[in-house]
């Protein structure tokens, strides 16, 4: 299993390849706000652990294992963002909140959150009911 830091890199590499068709060390460094030398070290570790294939000065490609995990990590991130929106978290806080919790949840918890997101999205009335509860609770705490 990849570490949380490895997950961040795999997720970002997956997104860059999906968006641009490739991922360069400089692109990864910029996206993660880290030094290129840090990216090179991590990419070498990810290569050793068979998440990607890296050739110095030629670039990198995700292996089947890396693609599968990258896809799952992007799904997890997007699902948690959906969940935050459903429960009414302010849009400006969602990204940081998701970044803060995504590595600490089990895949079972992610699957259950997926069930909850599906439950709310299947019927708008459920979200309206949640908003009414939140409004009532907000007024009670004033």
From Swiss-Prot:
Annotated residues for binding of Mn(2+) 2: 11, 77, 99, 102
Residues noted as binding Mn(2+) 1 in the record, renumbered to the chain: 8, 99, 102-103
Keyword DNA-binding belongs to the record: yes
Domain HTH dtxR-type: 1-63
Pfam families assigned to the protein according to its UniProt record, in alphabetical order: Fe_dep_repr_C (PF02742), Fe_dep_repress (PF01325)
Main subcellular location: cytoplasm
GO molecular function: DNA binding; DNA-binding transcription factor activity; manganese ion binding; protein dimerization activity
Protein location: Cytoplasm
A single GO BP: intracellular manganese ion homeostasis
Keyword presence, Kinase: no
Modulation of this protein's activity: DNA binding is strongly activated by Mn(2+).
Subunit annotation: Homodimer.
Function description: Central regulator of manganese homeostasis.
Family: Belongs to the DtxR/MntR family.
Name recorded for this polypeptide: HTH-type transcriptional regulator MntR
């Amino acid at each position: 299993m990849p570490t949380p830091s490895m997950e961040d890199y795999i997720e970002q590499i997956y997104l860059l390849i999906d968006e641009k068709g490739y991922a360069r060390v400089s692109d990864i460094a910029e996206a993660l706000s880290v030094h290129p030398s840090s990216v090179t070290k991590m990419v070498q570790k990810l290569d050793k652990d068979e998440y990607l294939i890296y050739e110095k000065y030629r670039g990198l490609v995700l292996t089947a294992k890396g693609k599968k995990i990258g896809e799952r990590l992007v799904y997890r991130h997007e699902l948690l963002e959906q969940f935050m929106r459903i429960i009414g978290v302010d849009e400006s806080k969602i990204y940081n909140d998701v970044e803060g919790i995504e590595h600490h949840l089990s895949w079972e918890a992610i699957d259950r959150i997926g069930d909850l997101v599906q439950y709310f999205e299947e019927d708008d009335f459920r979200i309206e009911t949640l908003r009414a509860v939140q409004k009532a609770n907000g007024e009670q705490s004033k």
